[in-house]
């Protein structure tokens, strides 16, 4: 893509209000009685809501002082421990025959360090080791059904040390975090980027959570461990399914842990444990997460720009007070037959099929994918309604995932649970009648979790060389894709287009659902958070058959951070059966940095990536 043209368009976009589009639109008609307030009422509103955020300067100042004290304490503890552990290490080393390599000797040291006594020397006073397990090559680790968020444990792991730490965060709360530490040290002094089950690559990767779920995401951590990262993940301070929110009732400290504190503390302590295990600091620190995990990554880089060198976030649920109240509102009118916006669940598939019929060819290719949902409009039955933004609407093409939010007798817990337990502290709050604007204002006033990622000027992260990649599926039926447009545009307004272009890339993914998957046979896999789990617990480390920075977003981020290779395109992949690699590749297509889009060359195979190019519309 021509860079001046891209910057020129960004400059034009920076003068627009919110996420409104200046593109030509067409009228979209939908079967059935869909009136004002429907799930994808696409009217553009132009107001600036009051922002809510958490000032962290004072906290970070105290944290740095605490780090200094903790580090001195850790060194004293380490000196005592090394008297004992050094003798054990020496015993192991002298037993090594002359034919063994120096790497084998280093491996022996790592196996000794997979010991709670050794690792405890690197913990602050409010943290304790809960479990340390040495996992053999091809083994498994996790907590099974005791983990209410993700009970499936990863299998086929590389040799590693699995660690669980419990941290007291307040007199009434605590959180846990886990680590996977690949047991074989790198034989190179430089971090390398090969995907294998071999040595540690010298990098640290933190992974995020989902919904309101509480539990350590071992299954998602395995994606990083198979790429040879040392990996961190937190349980956010509780144990629950992603749709269970009752744990938050009258528990402000637990809500704070979920909002930001558990992940932030896990990164800080996990960094020290990595140093304790390997005898050296990680050379680079990365983050990968989607949905709530996307929000967590944005929140942490805003709070502590030093935490990560590179951040990969998908479908971020960053605007908590607006997104979650939006989920309550849409659930209110879609789930009640007596309301004008009611949509019977059996109509979801009918609507989705007709959207494809009307909108598929807008990009010049009839392939079953709605690639330009922003070009469509669904006129409101009440155009005179008060144009106050609650949250951005779901897009045409997202109908395949509506049942996850709306096929029920009451609003989803993402909305109703949030309002009852985070906002009002009333488990009997009546969802059938409420004032929309007042609910949002109450959420902004009463939700003190600090979860929202609403600090748009992230210059401190950019100034230290940080890189950010954000992606979002156009067919996301849970977190509307245009919410990411909104975040991008507000950051653009706060920082300016030239600075943004140097460190921030946003990729929209036509046809992809929430974080992964598709009902349109659309290319969806870019090696991002959680995507390998579509293939089972013995998942892959990257995009199967395409383990390189052109196809894998995490590897692309590594190349950008460490080698300065700009990410101006990613190639997404899907298979003939979307989650079965053995059925063969069905399609590959380039993803383009927003606001560019992929355009077919008019001649080549539409299923081949090389037949498409990135272009910015006039």
PLM feature segments, named:
Residues 1-68:
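Intrinsically disordered, low-complexity terminal tails of fungal membrane proteins
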Residues 28, 96-202, 218-219, 365-370, ...:
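Catalytic-loop region of hydrolases
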Residues 174-178, 189-194, 216-221, 236, ...:
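Short, solvent-exposed loop/turn and secondary-structure capping segments
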Residues 197-201, 210-279, 325, 430-437, ...:
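Cap/lid segment of the alpha/beta-hydrolase catalytic domain
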Residues 200-204, 227-231, 280-285, 306-310, ...:
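Loop/turn elements at helix/coil->beta-strand transitions in domains of secreted/extracellular proteins
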Residues 289-293, 297:
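Gly/Ala-rich beta-loop-alpha elbow adjacent to hydrolase catalytic centers
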Residues 299-301, 306-389, 524-549:
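A catalytic-pocket lid/entrance helix-loop region that shapes and gates access to the active site
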Residues 390-591:
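C-terminal subdomain of alpha/beta-hydrolase-fold enzymes, centered on the catalytic histidine
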């Amino acid at each position: 893509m021509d860079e001046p043209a891209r910057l020129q368009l960004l400059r034009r976009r920076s003068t627009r209000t919110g996420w409104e589009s200046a593109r030509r639109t067409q009228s979209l008609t939908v079967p059935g009685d869909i009136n004002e307030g429907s799930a994808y009422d696409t009217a553009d509103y132009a107001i600036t809501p009051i922002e809510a955020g958490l000032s962290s300067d004072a906290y970070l100042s105290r944290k740095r002082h605490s780090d200094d004290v903790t580090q001195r304490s850790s060194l004293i503890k380490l000196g005592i421990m090394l008297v004992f552990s050094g003798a054990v290490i020496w015993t192991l080393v002298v037993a090594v025959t002359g034919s063994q390599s120096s790497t084998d000797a280093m491996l022996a040291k790592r196996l000794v360090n997979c010991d709670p006594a050794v690792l405890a020397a690197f913990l602050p006073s409010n943290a304790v080791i809960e479990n340390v397990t040495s996992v053999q090559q091809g083994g498994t680790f996790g907590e099974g059904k005791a983990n209410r968020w993700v009970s499936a444990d990863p299998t086929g792991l590389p040799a590693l040390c699995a660690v669980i730490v419990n941290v007291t965060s307040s007199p009434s709360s605590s959180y846990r975090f886990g680590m996977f530490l690949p047991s074989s040290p790198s034989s190179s002094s430089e971090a390398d980027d090969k995907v294998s089950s071999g040595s540690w690559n010298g990098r640290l990767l933190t992974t995020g959570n989902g919904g309101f779920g509480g539990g350590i995401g071992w299954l998602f951590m395995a994606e990083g461990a198979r790429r040879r990262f040392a990996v961190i993940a937190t349980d956010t301070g509780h144990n629950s399914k992603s749709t269970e929110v009752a744990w938050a009732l009258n528990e402000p400290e637990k809500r704070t842990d979920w909002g930001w504190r558990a992940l932030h503390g896990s990164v800080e302590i996990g960094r020290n444990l990595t140093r304790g295990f390997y005898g050296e600091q990680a050379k680079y620190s990365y983050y990968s997460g989607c949905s709530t995990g996307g929000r967590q990554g944005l929140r942490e880089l805003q709070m502590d720009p030093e935490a990560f060198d590179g951040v990969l976030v998908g479908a971020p649920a960053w605007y908590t007070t607006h997104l979650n109240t939006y989920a309550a509102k849409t659930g209110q009118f879609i789930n009640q037959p007596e309301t004008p916006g009611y949509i019977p669940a059996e109509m979801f598939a009918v609507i989705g099929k007709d959207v494809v019929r009307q909108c598929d060819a807008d990009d010049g290719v009839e392939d079953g994918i709605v690639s330009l949902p922003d070009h469509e409009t669904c006129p409101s039955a009440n155009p005179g309604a008060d144009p106050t933004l609650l949250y951005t609407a779901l897009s045409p093409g997202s109908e395949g995932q509506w049942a996850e939010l709306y096929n029920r007798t009451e609003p989803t817990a993402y909305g109703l649970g949030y309002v009852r337990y985070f906002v009002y502290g009333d488990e009997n709050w009546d969802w059938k009648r409420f004032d929309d604007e007042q609910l949002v204002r109450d959420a902004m006033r009463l939700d003190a979790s600090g979860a929202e990622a609403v600090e748009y000027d992230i210059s401190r992260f950019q100034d230290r060389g940080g890189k950010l990649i954000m992606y979002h599926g156009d067919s996301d039926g849970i977190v509307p894709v245009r919410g990411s447009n909104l975040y991008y545009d507000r950051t653009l307004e706060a920082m300016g287009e030239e600075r943004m272009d140097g460190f921030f890339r946003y990729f929209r993914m036509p046809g992809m659902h929430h974080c992964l998957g598709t009902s349109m046979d659309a290319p969806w896999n870019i090696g991002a958070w959680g995507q390998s789990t579509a293939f089972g617990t013995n998942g892959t480390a990257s995009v199967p058959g395409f383990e390189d920075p052109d196809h894998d977003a995490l590897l692309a981020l590594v190349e950008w951070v460490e080698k300065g290779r700009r990410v101006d395109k990613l190639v997404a992949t899907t298979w003939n059966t979307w989650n079965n690699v053995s059925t063969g590749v069905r399609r590959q297509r380039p993803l383009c940095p927003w606001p560019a889009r992929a355009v077919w060359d008019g001649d080549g195979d539409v299923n081949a990536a090389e037949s498409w190019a990135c272009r910015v519309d006039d």
